[in-house]
């Protein structure tokens, strides 16, 4: 009888250790942006696109414009962040890296911005301010359909607005590239 009980306890211990071994999948996902820049995140998402989903793009800001690829945006210029990407100038001191990817013909068709928030505790506050700033914009040349704001990893905020189908493709590409992607806001802008 002691052998049977010892065997049962051993099996229970073995099963519990085995079951606990696969439980830390979230830790790897939370760190999937470690060592990445804002441009890297956009490049990784863009690389997932099929050829028939791609369109003419440009990236960067007025001083760092890149054709056919994402580009870096100067985070010390709050006015440019706001004018180009809808990022609130008052929150510029909370980020230390940014990048953009835009439809070459019309920013309202598609614009994506990635922002590295210096303190992880500020991610939600940055996302809130970004949402409010974009929702209150006066649009020219038509309204974008959707605004979606994500957190990626511990310190990145990604905002994308534009035509619904293009925004949906970007969302799929970002989630495919980064398992830590969480949707914070999904708003209709086509009032």
Predicted regions and their residues:
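Positively charged n-region of N-terminal signal peptides that target proteins for export
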Residues: 1-4, 9
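Soluble, non-membrane globular domain cores that form compact, hydrophobic packing
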Residues: 21-111, 117-191
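C-terminal motif of bacterial Sec signal peptides marking the signal peptidase cleavage site
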Residues: 15-19
